[in-house]
């Protein structure tokens, strides 16, 4: 079990276990519309059912870390998509497990 290094409070309604992760990288940074830049804290809910358009944390089978992406469901096929259009769609075909759905963000402005 990993040691907890920081505690954050939230009034968000969480249906399962909740945990915060800090965004690393620019795959969720967009030039227009919703953007979640590097350094932002995101609260994930493990008990919430992911839907089309949900922002999710997922563990890819062949990766050592989790990925934070938007879930796209199109014609029965599921994909993970960054908000940054420079990143490709990741087809979901048994190659990942969705761990939780994002319910809140928190970031410092200075």
Q: For each predicted feature, which ranges?
A:
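Glycine- and charge-enriched low-complexity intrinsically disordered segments
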Residues: 72-110
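Charged, alpha-helix-enriched surfaces in structured cytosolic catalytic cores
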Residues: 51, 66, 97
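Short, surface-exposed beta-strand-loop junctions and turns on beta-sheet-rich folds
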Residues: 37, 64, 86-88
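A short, contiguous structural element within a folded domain that forms the immediate neighborhood
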Residues: 1-62
């Amino acid at each position: 079990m990993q040691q907890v290094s920081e505690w954050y409070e939230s009034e968000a309604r969480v249906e399962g276990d909740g945990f915060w992760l800090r965004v690393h990288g620019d795959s969720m940074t967009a030039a227009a519309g919703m953007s979640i830049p590097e350094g932002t804290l995101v609260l994930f809910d493990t008990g919430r059912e992911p839907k089309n358009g949900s922002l999710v944390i997922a563990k890819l089978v062949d990766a050592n870390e989790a990925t934070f992406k938007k879930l796209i469901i199109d014609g029965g096929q599921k994909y993970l998509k960054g908000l940054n259009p420079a990143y490709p769609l990741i087809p979901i075909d048994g190659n990942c497990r969705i761990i939780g759905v994002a319910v809140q963000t928190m970031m410092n402005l200075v």
